[in-house]
Amino acid sequence: SAASFVANAIARGEISCGMAGGVESISLVQFNLNFNGFFYEPLQQMMPAVWWTMNQTADFVAERYQISRRDLDEYVVMSQKRVAEANAAGKYADEIVPFATKMKVTDKASGQSSMVDVTLDHDEGPRPDTTIEKLSALKPVLEGGTTTAGNASQLSDGAAAVVMMDAELAAKRGLPILGYWRGFALGSVAPEEMSIAITPAIRKLMKLNAVNAGD
């Protein structure tokens, strides 16, 4: 959405250059979620899936669209392999800006916690030693489900930003154009399958730009 705001402002001539960014901090949500007004009984009775956990929606989508546990695990192995190869080739070296911060570290033996200085300079999520055998040995989070700690999204904080500029200005300044903005679209689905909302959004965006998946 931030990128869309900047792109539209450039297209309207309001600005010629802008920065779009976003941040997600799961560490601020896990133990500090404000539950005031969180539950609304009439809606809960009518659409209980609004309050489903991510695990519940993931298992529901996997069952509805016939995605097996094996399918999920194989995709994870492929994804981990790709990111490991990209890291080894230095593909992300120019995209990650190191910065210093403090991190809370808890000693497993004593249970004591302390703040230490750290420099974040790489994505800590990838697990290059992931194998189908290791994933297959993990138990599902929910009984009878397909979601495990190995094939689910990780819990981590992250932030990203991109500089957007009018093409003529970029050319005038001799800056390399890494990509072009073609449009933005939103999609919506039922709460129980929220994880596939990107699908109708992509289809809408392709239709707006008169392209198909083959293009």
Predicted regions and their residues:
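N-terminal extracellular/periplasmic Venus flytrap/periplasmic-binding protein-like
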Residues: D71-K172
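Condensing-enzyme catalytic core of the thiolase-fold
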Residues: E85, E133, A161-G183, I196-L208
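Short acidic, glycine/serine/threonine-rich loops at helix termini
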Residues: L28-N34, S110-G111, E192-S195
